[in-house]
Each structure stands twice: as structure tokens, then as C-alpha cells.
Amino acid sequence: MHNAQYGFTLVQLLAAIAVIGCLTGMAWSGYRNSILDVRQLEARSRLADTLLQASTQSLASGRHAVICPAIDASACTVGSTDWSRGWIAFIDRNGNRQFDPADARFAHVALTGPVHITSSSGRTRIVYQPNGAPPGSNLTFTLCDTRGQSSATTLVMGNSGQWRSSKPNKGTTCPIIH
């Protein structure tokens, strides 16, 4: 009488588990990078959208429009080039370039997550002229995440108000983000 046994040996089972583990690890890495790419793209798109709104609002109102980094919707973060927590945009009715109760806020973007955004050195706010013209000098926003310099991108606004996405210069550093 022939006794056929069906099944796997312990060695075969362990080999299959090891292969599944390796494949899962590779898939997770790609998935994680895709999620970080999407978050960085979203932050860059929201920033570009606010720049466009500011130009339109300043032209429509005939007043200066200001965009500044902000932790909440109530005030600019004075002297900061860190836009990672978000920003506000408003029509500056009294010309002091700070958000006051009399000013008309038209955008508030709150960011969470692993994207770190910094503006060019010394650029703590963006002020659009009453005719909708941009501030008059180049401005670069650098967007970094937990992957560091290798995956950083920039949003560059030229003197004409046109913006483009690119890779940061070689000397640009990204903070360590956990």
C-alpha cells in the first residue's frame, strides 16, 4: 500500500516566508517613496496656488497682497523663512505687512506631515504690488522630506511672477526630519 503525503516541509515553509518578507520589504519602500512624493507635490501645488491667488487678489483690490509663514490663521510668524507649518495670505489694508483684524485674509494653508519648506534667505514674506506684480526679485522655496537632499525639490518664482519646479542647487541642505 502506497501512502502519499501532501504538504510542505519546514524548510520549504521558511523559504516561502523569507521570499514573501523580501518582496513585502521592497514593495513597502516603493510605496513609502510614492506617498512622500505625493505629499511634497501637494505642498508645492498649494504654495503655487496661493501665489496665483495673491496676484489676482492684489490686482482686483488695488492693494498689496501679502503671503507669510504662519502657525495658525491669526498672525504671521515674524522673521521666519520656515513655511513648514503653513501660511496665510491677505490684503494688507494698512500697509504694515502684518496680518491685522482689519485685513482681508483670502487664504490659510495649514500643513502637517514630513514636508519641510524654507524660502530664500531673508524672504520672510511675499508682497504683491497693487497692480498684481510680484515682489521684483527671485524667490526660491525648497521642499525637503525625510529622504533628505536627494529627493528635495524647489519652487522658483522669477521676477516676472512665473514659477517653475526644479531640483535645488548642490549647496542646498535639508534639515533632518524624523
Which stretches of residues belong to each language-model region?
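N-terminal helix-rich module
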Residues: H2-N3, C22, M26-A60, H64-H178
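Glycine-centered recognition micro-motifs in short, flexible terminal segments and loops
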Residues: M1-T24
